[in-house]
Amino acid sequence: MPSEVVNGNFRLDRLPHIWCPGCGHGILMHTVAKAIDELEIDKDKVCIVSGIGCSSRASGYFNYNTVHTTHGRALSFATGIKIANPELKVIVITGDGDATAIGGNHLIHSCRRNIDITTIVFNNNIYGMTGGQYSPTTNTDDKATTAPYRNIDKPFDVCSLSAAAGATFVARGSVYHVKQMINYTKRAITHKGFSVVEGISSCPTYYGRKNKKGSAVDLMKDIKNSCILSDDINKGKDDNKISIGVFKDVSLPEYTKEYQRLVVKANSK
């Protein structure tokens, strides 16, 4: 990570981070910082909110306003922060378990409301911090601590779920596609409405080891070979490929603006 990005955006006394060697979350954290840096946003106008899990430890490293909340509830806290302080750029960092399991209900209703919050989902297909249990995004037939023979569940597609629930900007990048991930994050932050950017990440400690994926480098190569650049969310699914691109970008009434109009109307009665 370039020194100018580190020095300007992170709490140096909190580094080094806690993530395992080869974990992709540090790369995704860098893409968020780089996006904010390139947009030249006033750091005092940024608020990073996270829940619980490996990904959610990221909030403590950023040198902005940060809130480390409870499991699955980051979007609830973020909604309150945004409504009370509509001028803030509120960015939620969450994981696949935090966002789609215990926090799944909050995710779909945040999408439905179209509140101006950017949500970055660090998706490593497993619960890393609690011991390698399978998550709602773990692929069918993959193994995990709680699926020692194989996972029989079908996984959520975070982007399809978010788009269907009403998010007005939906994109997916990966730890290999760093430039694209930075670009998608910048577009999400500047978008007026609820934005979801899924970042495909790597967990060599649990997901890689349980599924015999090899080293951290092998996992990175696997992500590279599994992804295709396309704005068609369904392209490559029949061949077990993952689309990397912007799948939805529409303009619809934003929640805090509608709320403010409602307050004005109520006060005029």
Residue ranges of model-derived segments:
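Short coil/turn connectors at secondary-structure junctions
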Residues: 15, 42-46, 84-90, 112-118, ...
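Flexible, low-complexity linker and terminal segments
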Residues: 1-5, 201-269
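Thiamine diphosphate
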Residues: 49-128
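Short, hinge-like loop/turn segments at secondary-structure boundaries
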Residues: 65-66, 110, 135-139, 213-216
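Short catalytic-loop micro-motif centered on adjacent basic/acidic residues
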Residues: 19-21, 92-94, 169-174, 196
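Glycine-rich beta-alpha junction loops
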Residues: 52-54, 124-126, 177, 200-206, ...
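Conserved thiamine diphosphate
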Residues: 6, 135-187
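Active-site diphosphate/adenylate-binding microenvironment
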Residues: 2-70
